[in-house]
Amino acid sequence: MEKYLIVGLGNPGSNYAKTRHNAGFMVINEICNKLNLFLDNSKFNGMFAKTIYNNCVVFFCQPTTYMNLSGEFVSKMLKFYDIPIKNLIVIYDDVDTKLGVIKLRKKGSSGGQNGIKNIINLLKTEEIKRIRVGIGKDPHAKLDQYVLSNFKIDELVIIKPAIIKGALAALEAIGEDFDKVMNKFN
């Protein structure tokens, strides 16, 4: 059976749970709610749920390191469970994408996002499938303060459908041609 590692990026702790930077965690939580899974397994500074989905063994994960160290968890999980990089999908927030929009890519640079940057550096490849959740940006705020701020109430109405759509895209990508999934969701 093929194995997949689906990783949502964010920062651990309840004080970060509703921040923009935790959009990746929010997508993983949405998937787990949809599939009635619990992130109750712990390994390599991360939490994960393991299940069979679309005839594949799938690990839905949230690193418990801070965002900029996410690659340590990802590289150890890939190696330990013998998961090929082609079956890695990383989900994270993107300030360069409009609030509420998701974008799927098969490869590319980090775009300045420190979590995916660390993963790219440790895996030594930019050929990593990803789902970027648009959080937009505030031209009047410092970037670090903005990404670590909670979504405003009126923004939650916009981001929630994107979280659901990101979860559906991740699930559809398991065992399927990623180009086909990109065409559907982009």
UniProtKB/Swiss-Prot annotation:
TRNA binds at residues 16, 66, 68, 114. It is an enzyme of class 3 (hydrolase). It is found in: Cytoplasm. The keyword ATP-binding does not apply. The keyword RNA-binding applies. InterPro entries: Pept_tRNA_hydro, Pept_tRNA_hydro_CS, Pept_tRNA_hydro_sf. GO terms for biological process: protein quality control for misfolded or incompletely synthesized proteins; rescue of stalled ribosome. GO terms for molecular function: peptidyl-tRNA hydrolase activity; tRNA binding. It comes from the Bacteria. The active site is at 21 (proton acceptor). Keywords: Cytoplasm, Hydrolase, RNA-binding, tRNA-binding. Monomer. It holds the Pfam family Pept_tRNA_hydro. It catalyses: an N-acyl-L-alpha-aminoacyl-tRNA + H2O = an N-acyl-L-amino acid + a tRNA + H(+). This is Peptidyl-tRNA hydrolase. Its EC number is 3.1.1.29. The record marks 11 as: Discriminates between blocked and unblocked aminoacyl-tRNA. Hydrolyzes ribosome-free peptidyl-tRNAs (with 1 or more amino acids incorporated), which drop off the ribosome during protein synthesis, or as a result of ribosome stalling. Catalyzes the release of premature peptidyl moieties from peptidyl-tRNA molecules trapped in stalled 50S ribosomal subunits, and thus maintains levels of free tRNAs and 50S ribosomes.
